Amino acid sequence: MTKKIVALAGDGIGPEIMEASLEVLEALAEKTGFDYEIDRRPFGGAGIDAAGHPLPDETLKACREADAILLAAIGSPQYDSATVRPEQGLLALRKELNLYANIRPVKIFESLKHLSPLKSERIAGVDFVVVRELTGGIYFGDHILEERKARDINDYSYEEVERIIRKAFEIARNRRKIVTSIDKQNVLATSKLWREVAETVAQDFPDVTLEHQLVDSAAMLMITNPAKFDVIVTENLFGDILSDESSVLSGTLGVMPSASHSENGPSLYEPIHGSAPDIAGQGIANPISMILSVAMMLRDSFGRFEDAERIEHAVEVSLAAGILTRDLGGRASTKEMTEAIIARL
């Protein structure tokens, strides 16, 4: 059956890295017989330009009907002070598709270890996943600003906590089988609920070890001993901070993909970096995060594990061969990086 993939190129370097990733997907499909079609839609600043809204109705309709969604990058300086901004499109898309689970893998490529701000021995063996709850918590609670006083409500239901923790256990089952649940149980009521739910869900996964960690000590361990982690699961606010902290371990945002999953609808795959408008159109953008996001899509949405591994291996050996874009310390163009990966599929 033909798989429908919606491509949201977005803004800045988005169109360049999207096309690079689709070239890799096309080359892979020729070798493996993967049957798919691409539906390109405007989104972000491109959506505002085309339809006056960062998430046009037709784009949302296409996303609802898709088997998976690829997003490259959004954001443009021309909208920084505007009422309608590209970033509002992503928030709306997450809400409309109920993308509750953000998955961010953190892996250090051997050939890029020198880019990390940490000593090489400290990042040896780092390979973990951050699972962040994306649609609940303090970001979605009431925000009250009064004269000389303010409060933000952190609100979670049992069901919201259960589904994200269950997702983490399912991921851990196919890895090293360790879940580290991160909370602030010694202070926060929501964290007390979080820990209670984690203990309950763990009973359904006797083959997976559950560990608890307070968020402050987890932030420290991510720097002092990051290799200890396998699958981290945490609430929205903590996950926002810790996933950004984890992204600096590699020393570059240019090789880090991510996914956002719903319960029953399509998943969204995107790089963690921004739209880099300062280098847009120059042909020097690093496409690896977008290409690895395609690999995540093949594995998570379509169960094509070998195809995903072929892409990931091609990326790894290309980097090991010294083919590096400028952000990685090399001179390869977007086109040269893409061609190198395709040649090694």
Predicted feature locations:
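Glycine-rich phosphate/diphosphate-binding loop of Rossmann-like nucleotide-binding domains
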Residues: V6-E23, A27-A29, E147-D216, K228
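Buried hydrophobic positions in well-ordered alpha/beta secondary-structure cores of metabolic enzymes
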Residues: D11-G14, D67, V131, A168, ...
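Buried hydrophobic packing segments
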Residues: S21, L25, A198, M290-S301, ...
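Flexible, glycine/charged-enriched surface loops at secondary-structure junctions
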Residues: G33-D39, R175-D183, F205-Q213, G303-R310, ...
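N-terminal beta-loop-helix "entrance" segment that forms/cooperates
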Residues: G33-D57, M222
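Glycine-rich phosphate/nucleotide-binding loop
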Residues: G45-I48, H114, M222-I323
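N-terminal glycine-rich phosphate/adenylate-binding segment common to multiple enzyme folds
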Residues: D49-N154, L237
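Short acidic loop-to-helix transition motifs that present clustered carboxylates
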Residues: S111, Q213-M220
